């Protein structure tokens, strides 16, 4: 009993951390079941994004939207960006430019996908975005910071521009928002006159 009494503060810290972990797991578990019911639509150009209700828009202009979790403190953000001119570069060249700009180097074991039929559910999106590259996995930024990075580069048929959609977090947080980012893009669709919910 003396051991517990002499380390009461230490035990209190352990119990608080344990309680916080259980609470976080409970919230995340609820989020996974409520994504479809409680997501909202955000208009981005001629696209409609399905966004989880717990993502907050922290930056927005005509060609860029940034989402963050303002209800938690963990290190994560997602950006959806459109660049009007690809300057004659191929998708692999654009990917290389982006990774060099951000000073990101992936580990060897990454997910790599170029088939729009695998990435998107909507048949119009699959047809229009036949040029797509997705890379997901762990890596390093600035040769120091360990990150989990998921990036989609997409170009529509007959479009001189291209999209970059990215999700970046610490390695430990990569599995928290990553599935929702992937689901958001899997649900990507074009705006139709009957759709509402613009942001």
Walk through the language-model features, giving the residues of each.
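N-terminal signal-anchor transmembrane alpha helix of single-pass membrane proteins
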Residues: 1-32
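N-terminal "mature-domain start" segment
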Residues: 33-64
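Conserved polar/disulfide-associated segments of primarily extracytoplasmic proteins
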Residues: 2, 58-164, 173, 197
């Amino acid at each position: 009993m003396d051991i517990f009494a002499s380390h009461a503060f230490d035990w209190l810290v352990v119990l608080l951390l344990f309680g916080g972990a259980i609470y976080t797991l409970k919230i995340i578990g609820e989020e996974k079941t409520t994504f479809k019911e409680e997501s909202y639509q955000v208009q981005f150009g001629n696209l409609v994004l399905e966004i989880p209700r717990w993502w907050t828009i922290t930056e927005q202009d005509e060609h860029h939207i940034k989402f963050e979790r303002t209800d938690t403190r963990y290190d994560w953000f997602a950006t959806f960006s459109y660049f009007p001119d690809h300057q004659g570069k191929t998708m692999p060249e654009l990917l290389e430019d982006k990774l060099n700009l951000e000073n990101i180097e992936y580990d060897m074991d990454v997910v790599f996908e170029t088939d729009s039929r695998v990435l998107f559910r909507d048949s119009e999106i699959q047809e229009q975005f036949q040029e797509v590259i997705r890379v997901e996995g762990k890596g390093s930024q600035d040769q120091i910071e360990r990150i989990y990075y998921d990036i989609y580069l997409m170009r529509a048929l007959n479009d001189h521009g291209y999209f970059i959609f990215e999700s970046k977090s610490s390695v430990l947080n990569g599995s928290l928002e990553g599935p929702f980012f992937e689901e958001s893009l899997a649900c990507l669709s074009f705006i139709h006159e009957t759709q509402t919910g613009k942001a």
